[in-house]
Regions:
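Histidine/acidic-residue-rich catalytic or RNA/ligand-binding cores of hydrolases
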Residues: 128-131, 168-169, 244-246, 284-290, ...
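Histidine-rich, glycine-flanked metal-binding segment
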Residues: 42-58, 67, 72-114
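Divalent metal-dependent hydrolysis catalytic cores, especially in the metallo-beta-lactamase
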Residues: 142-167, 182-190, 230-241, 273, ...
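C-terminal cap of metal-dependent C-N hydrolases
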Residues: 65, 399-401, 418-461
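Active-site mouth loops of central-metabolism enzymes
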Residues: 127-139, 201-220, 273-275
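Metal-associated gating/positioning segment near the N- to mid-region
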Residues: 108-177, 195-196, 202-203, 258, ...
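His/Asp/Glu-enriched, well-ordered alpha-helical/loop segment
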Residues: 269-271, 344-431
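Histidine/acidic residue-rich metal-binding segments in metalloenzymes
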Residues: 170, 216-236, 242-316, 342-361
Length: 463
């Protein structure tokens, strides 16, 4: 299937599925123009840019009993946030911010208001099952991302379309154009895999990962992704792991280092960033040496590697929950009868990373709709606190301002500040004391539009 045909088919599927699901699930508001991107890094599709929906007209004033300052990692009391259109126009103490007489006031004086959460590693598409149409696959993806939005994740980085070609690009664009509700997305398209055994899926499905065999076609694969509109280049320097009889873990390495270096160099030449799926071993080492911008998973990351990542300015995205239970326990039980377990190794690595000064540790769930259901990603914050020893405030920073910075969106999201998008969430308690408050979301606003308000009667919230 040609790239053009693939894009046309994906766009048709997204359009049909989006129209159907939006009609069924949401009553939308009429819309208008968008705003240009002013940040660094991959070009996002913030919108709407001529789409159908927009936030309510006039000024919105949010009274916050407690407001989380994600820059400083602390709570501020009795704050007011003024919003016009999609943007925040003023933030400050209630005694200092004058609320216009005609403003619509949202009273969250008994709640904690935070920036919208950012999930740095999602898969909106499930792997397609035999006989599943692209339209059905797209419907499921839209349902997934809307569950994420209602759970408070107003932005996300989608790390490959799970054998659905570049349909994630079309969904990202549909969201930015206001045609469907969903988080602000950066996407990675098909992903690039090493030819040979790891490319068998592509032989069965031409929309699966794009296989490469040498440095030249590696560079061409990066260019194809950029031409199709991918924001990130998803690479797979490492594959599965297995325990030897001695208890030592062995990891599959895929691309030779020169090919991996060509992939990353071409990505950077085109002003994009690379995300590398590695579980450990030589592939993990190569990803760091080659300068992969974000290292995903890395079960046995060690201090020497973490220190090198700090020097190179790389970020670590463990996807803690997704790769522990049930994945690791199931894998290790089948392979060793539970004699050897990866979970303690992974927990040690994440705790070490969290304690490494200067290392940017991201909050990315790895949610895939199969082993980890969409809408449940707030569990990732809890595990960082309870298993990796992060303070709740630092975990909140990882899932907001740090993720925004790594994604190049630091001027637009990740903090409640003047000029940024009005992406806000609210919970009843104090998540800096009890991080599980994020699992009981009450209010979600994206770009000044109220997505969820569980404080209201169901009939009122639906209007």
């Amino acid at each position: 299937m040609s790239g053009t045909s693939m894009r046309r088919s994906a766009a048709i599927a997204v359009g049909a599925a989006g129209a159907l699901l939006t009609t069924v699930l949401h009553a939308q508001e009429p819309g208008g123009p968008g705003a240009p991107w002013r940040g660094a890094g991959p070009q996002p599709c913030f919108g709407p840019d001529g789409g159908t929906y927009r936030p309510a007209a006039g000024v919105i004033a949010v009274r916050a009993g407690r407001l989380f300052d994600s820059r400083r990692g602390e709570l501020l009391s009795d704050q007011v946030v003024l919003i016009e259109g999609e943007r925040i126009t003023e933030v400050g103490a209630a005694a200092q911010v004058k609320i216009p007489a005609d403003a619509r006031v949202i009273d969250l004086s008994r709640e904690t208001v935070l920036p919208g959460l950012i999930d740095a590693h999602t898969h909106m598409f499930n792997y397609p099952k035999p006989g599943m149409s692209r339209e059905t696959s797209t419907l499921i993806a839209i349902h997934n991302l809307q569950a994420d939005l209602r759970a408070g994740f107003t932005a996300a980085r989608d790390m490959s379309s799970h054998s659905n070609g570049y349909a994630d690009v079309d969904i990202r664009n549909a969201i930015s154009q206001g045609r469907i509700d969903g988080p602000r997305f950066q996407v990675a398209g098909r992903g690039i895999v090493w030819g040979g055994a790891t490319a068998t899926a592509t032989q069965k499905n031409p929309l699966a990962g794009l296989p490469v065999h040498a440095e030249d076609d590696a560079r061409a694969a990066v260019r194809e992704h950029v031409e199709h509109g991918a924001d990130w280049i998803k690479l797979y320097p490492g594959g599965a792991y297995a325990f030897l009889g001695t208890g030592e873990a062995k990891y599959v390495m895929t691309y030779p280092l020169p090919v991996l270096q060509a992939l990353i160099d071409e990505t950077h030449r085109l002003n994009h960033k690379a995300a590398c799926h590695v579980l450990g071993g030589e592939g993990q080492k190569n990803a760091i040496v080659a300068g992969c911008d974000t290292v995903e998973h890395a079960f046995d990351l060690n201090q020497e590697q973490a220190d090198l990542m700090v020097v190179k300015g790389l970020a670590y995205d463990p996807t803690f929950v997704r790769y522990t239970e049930p994945y690791m326990d199931d894998n290790d039980t089948k392979a060793t009868g539970g004699k050897y377990r990866m979970i303690p190794i992974f927990v040690k690595a994440v705790a070490m990373a969290a304690a490494t000064k200067g290392l940017k540790v991201m909050i990315g769930s790895g949610v895939d709709g199969a082993t980890f259901p969409h809408g449940a990603q707030a569990l990732e914050f809890e595990w960082f606190v309870k298993r990796a020893g992060m303070s709740p405030a630092r975990a909140l920073q990882s899932g907001t301002v740090i993720n925004a910075e790594v994604m190049g969106w630091q001027n637009e999201v990740g903090a409640i500040e003047k000029g940024k998008y009005a992406d806000l969430i609210a919970v009843s308690g104090d998540p800096t004391a009890d991080i599980t408050q994020l699992q009981r979301m009450e209010v979600v606003m994206k770009g000044g539009k109220l997505i969820r308000d569980d404080r209201l009667p169901r009939s009122a919230a639906a209007r």
